[in-house]
Amino acid sequence: KKLHRTRSNILNYEQLVKFTHKSQSVACQGCNNHCSLTINTFNDGTRLVAGNKCDKMVHRVETKKEELPDLYKIKTDMLNAQKKKFSHDKKIGMPLVLNNYDLLPFWTRFFDSLGYEIVWSTPSTKEMYHSGQQSIPSDTACFPAKVVHGHIQQLIDKGMDVIFYPCMTYNVDEHQSDNHYNCPLVAYYPEVIAANMDFDKTKIVYPFISFDDNATFAKAIRMHFEKVGIHFNEKDIIIAKNAAMNEYEAFH
C-alpha cells in the first residue's frame, strides 16, 4: 500500500508452475582479473549475476580498449630505449631485477659518464629461472628474488668480466614518507648471490651504497672497483652521480 501497488511482485501459482532456473559458471572477460561468475537465468529471460566484483557484467558496462593505455608496455619501451641510449667499448654487466628496473636510467647514465656501457640481463623467463635454480639457498625467498640467480648466471655465461650489483638499504628519497627503506631482500640480495654462486672468471662488485651522501657513495664505488682492477676518481664519480640523478628524475 505504501508503494501504491495494486498487487504484489511475488510470483503467483501459475508463474511458479512455469518457473525454471538455469545456473552457469563462467569467467568474466570484462578485464584481466577474469572473475569467476555464476549466471542464473530464469524462464522469463531475466538474469542474476553472482560473484562479480564490479558492475561491468551486471549493467553490461563496456570499456573501449583503445581508451586504456598499456602502462606496462609504455614503461618497458621506455626502459628498452634507455638501455640503447649509451654505447662504449668497455662494459659492465648488471642484472635487470628488483630495484634495478627503477634505477636503470640512473645506472646507464652513471656508467656512461665514467666511460662504460651497462650490459643488462634480458627479461625473466622460465628457462632463465631454471638456469640459476640450483644456487638458490632458501625456498622462503620470493620469486623475484629467486630469479635473480638466473639473471646473474646469464651474465656469467655471456663472459662478462665484471658484474655490478650493489646493496642498497635505502632507495631514492622521494620525500613522500618518513623513510625510504628498501625491502630487505631488495637491499641485501647481492650478498646472497655473492655467497652462493660460482662466478668462474667473472668478478662481482657489490658495495653497500646510499644516494644520500656523495662522499660515502664515491668512496664505496672507488674502493670496490679498485679490487677488480677498475680505477675511478672520486670527483668523477660524484659528477657522474649528479648527472645520473638528473637522468633518473627526468625519466620518472
Where do the model's predicted regions map?
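An N-terminal assembly and electron-transfer interface module characteristic of large anaerobic redox
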Residues: 1-252
